[in-house]
Amino acid sequence: MTSSKRAADRADQADIQAVSRVSQILSLFDPATLDVTAAQVAERLGLNRTTAYRYCTSLVAAGLLERNADGGYVPGGLLLQLGAFAIGHRRVINLAPRHMQALSRATQNSAVLCLWGLTGPVVSRVEENPSTIVVVSVRVGSHLPLDTAQSKVFLAYHADQLSMERLMATLSGPALDELRTEVARVREVGHCAAMSTPGVVAVAAPVFDEYGICATIAIVGPDNTLSMSDDAPELRVVVSTARELTKELGGHYRPDGPE
């Protein structure tokens, strides 16, 4: 191998590493982390502060980050523009609101639509029911953990089952065994009810477009009013809503069997 070839290979590897590092930095943001400092980036990613600062400065120049009044970094205009563009061009986002409003009214609970993010469901739209005294809701943009009903539905029906298995393998012991059992049950019955937060029940079903699962639709409510039973009337409404939205998207509702 010539020296010029080796130099080119090293440059390619450096470019790939830089892209990976940028992804890691942007992944630090979530609903609980609205801004970060270069010191926090360095600590969380195992970088020295000079390198972290250099990355953050470059991302500001590219429009992916911005400086706030406190000197920290927040998502930049280009990132927000791309995010809005990506979400806005998901057909399910445009078609779901009418179905979610009807679902919320019919069940007297908040309706929640989730799309699949990098490593799990992301809350993309919420329709609250204002007629109830106690409103249980969830913030748009929240990343849901693996033990939620929405996660289990995605794990059951996602097209890339190898990646789903790797994701589940981040757990171990009884927690992993329990999750695999529950995901298998979702494939069998076509829906999931779970209480991942004490006192709060979520009942979820999959939504499909022509390519496969594209979202989950769910209701969330207090455990003293929202049943986790397979014959609960609220569950029937959730499944019916998921089936109707799937039909409107041109998909096949897989829990109903083969096409």
Predicted regions and their residues:
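Extended hydrophobic
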Residues: 175-247, 251, 259
